[in-house]
Amino acid sequence: MAVLGPKATLAAVFIGPFIVACMLGIGLVYLLQLQVQIFHVKDTIRVTGKPATVSYTTSTPVTPSATTLDGTTYTLIRPTSSYTRVYLGTPRGFDYSTFGPKTLDYVTNLNLILILVVHILLRHCPGI
């Protein structure tokens, strides 16, 4: 067995674990992006599956909002020129109808995103 010099020992003790930690960090960030990307639906994140009515007009809404069937009103973060469609999930696609309940698929609070990310980390990375 060869005797390592002081420079080789320094490299083995500090640089090796640093490279491993960087690779592990990059891998975890990639997995997190992959998990969060599953929830992305054309600039929206599916937070709740509550039936809701989305308010829209032919012009830009003053306060874009969605009201669930129980009367709770959510202000939507991503306003568009008009709300003419609501995403109903992968099997059903977009609902272009103007009548009946819609499914709320817009992020209403940044805290929901943080809770979602923490939930994913705790569920898929229990060692963290």
From Swiss-Prot:
Pfam families to which the protein is assigned, alphabetical: Corona_NS4
Membrane topology label: Single-pass membrane protein
Highest taxon above the source species: Viruses
UniProt subcellular location: Host membrane
GO cellular component annotations of the record: host cell membrane; membrane
Keywords in alphabetical order: Host membrane, Membrane, Transmembrane, Transmembrane helix
Primary location: host cell
Keyword set includes rRNA processing: no
Bilayer-crossing regions: 12-32
Similarity field: Belongs to the coronaviruses ns4/ns4.8 protein family.
Protein name: Non-structural protein 4
